[in-house]
């Protein structure tokens, strides 16, 4: 259910807070250090204002910003784990909360582009999940495609958490992958500008509904002298309805109560519209156990490394040249 300014921990489930962090204007390493201090200060203030909160989420790019002229430079990149994530870990341990943070991560292979990474830190100060963005926002983003799959970890109140990053949420197969691995609360951290505001809302709801899981999503908010970032933190129920919807205000804290057991129960007890089950058991009324092969060509082709669209040879944009990244396979920005 939605939170009417709730401050306490629900008897079952947990309270989440999603921070519509102001889009950072970052021109130097000092600006990044300032952002980290601001994030930590905000985490502690949120815990003080909402004593029952157990999970606090910060959006994509909140640590290092979106200075596209510098975001690939060594000065702007961080390691995971590293001294900056240790600061986040210390804050989570002090506040006794789970935290979700965004890091543009230096690639261990210096000949390849950096990763766009999200981490979950538990109340003991341990990184319990590390995710590298699988689907960078082509053709704008130069991040190397993630190589860690879609991990799932235990969270508060019986939750099983997964994180996707921004454009990942537009890929329905990725939400299904998280659910297939047991996720019942799917987190989305984003740095979208207003061009896809409606689609953001739509996909947060559809990812919840198609997979019978909660979604908790938060975007940067404010203006960076180029784009406006829409905020619009959103918490969706496992039936696809919106429980809480934020506005476009920087610093807005979107809170809501989440009951993972209700999503788990729906997965166990629903017949109609239990679509994540039906995908692998189609027609089980007529055939015991149903048909296990969905017969979907694109899944077979994707698994075989043969995925190709009928119009692919005629597509106009298939590399990063339009944004100054002529794709050669080498490292940009060194």
Curated annotation (Swiss-Prot):
Statement: the UniProt record of this protein carries the keyword Hydrolase: yes
Query: Keyword annotations for this protein?
Result: Hydrolase
Q: Which residues form the active site?
A: 60 (proton acceptor), 133 (proton donor), 166 (nucleophile)
**One Pfam assignment:** CN_hydrolase
The record lists the catalysed reaction(s) as: formamide + H2O = formate + NH4(+)
Q: Which intervals hold domain CN hydrolase?
A: 14-260
Give the enzyme class: hydrolase
Keyword NADP carried by entry? no
Per the UniProt entry, the Enzyme Commission number(s) are: 3.5.1.49
What is an annotated GO biological process for this record, any one? putrescine biosynthetic process from arginine
Question: What terms describe the molecular function in GO for this protein?
Answer: formamidase activity; N-carbamoylputrescine amidase activity
Which family does the record claim for this protein? Belongs to the carbon-nitrogen hydrolase superfamily. Aliphatic amidase family.
Reported function: Is an aliphatic amidase with a restricted substrate specificity, as it only hydrolyzes formamide.
In Swiss-Prot or TrEMBL terms, this protein is called: Formamidase
């Amino acid at each position: 259910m939605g939170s009417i300014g709730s401050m306490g921990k629900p008897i079952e489930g947990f309270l989440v807070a999603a921070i519509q962090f102001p889009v950072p204007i970052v021109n130097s390493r000092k600006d990044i250090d300032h952002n980290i201090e601001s994030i930590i200060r905000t985490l502690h203030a949120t815990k003080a204002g909402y004593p029952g909160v157990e999970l606090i989420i910060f959006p994509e790019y909140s640590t290092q910003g979106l200075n596209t002229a510098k975001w690939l430079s060594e000065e702007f990149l961080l390691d995971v784990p590293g001294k900056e994530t240790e600061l986040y870990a210390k804050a989570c341990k002090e506040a006794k909360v789970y935290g979700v943070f965004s890091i543009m991560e230096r690639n261990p292979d210096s000949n390849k582009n950096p990763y766009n990474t999200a981490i979950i830190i538990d109340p003991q100060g341990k990184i319990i999940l590390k995710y590298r963005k699988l689907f960078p926002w082509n053709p704008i983003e130069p991040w190397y495609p993630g190589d860690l799959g879609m991990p799932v970890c235990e969270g508060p109140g019986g939750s099983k958490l997964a994180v996707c990053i921004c454009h990942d949420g537009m890929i329905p197969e990725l939400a299904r992958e998280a659910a297939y691995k047991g996720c019942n609360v799917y987190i989305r951290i984003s740095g979208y500008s207003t061009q896809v505001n409606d689609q953001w809302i739509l996909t947060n709801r559809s990812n919840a509904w198609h997979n019978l899981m909660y979604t908790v999503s938060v975007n940067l908010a404010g203006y960076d002298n180029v784009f406006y970032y829409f905020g619009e933190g959103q918490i969706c129920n496992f039936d696809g309805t919106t429980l809480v919807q934020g506005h476009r205000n920087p610093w807005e804290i979107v809170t809501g109560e989440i009951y993972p057991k209700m999503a788990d129960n729906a997965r166990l007890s629903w017949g109609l519209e239990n679509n994540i089950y039906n995908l692998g058991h189609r027609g089980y009324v007529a055939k015991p156990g149903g048909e296990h092969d969905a017969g979907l060509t694109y899944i077979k082709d994707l698994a075989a490394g043969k995925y190709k669209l009928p119009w692919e040879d005629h597509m106009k944009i298939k590399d990063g040249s339009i944004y100054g990244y002529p794709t050669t396979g080498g490292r940009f920005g060194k």
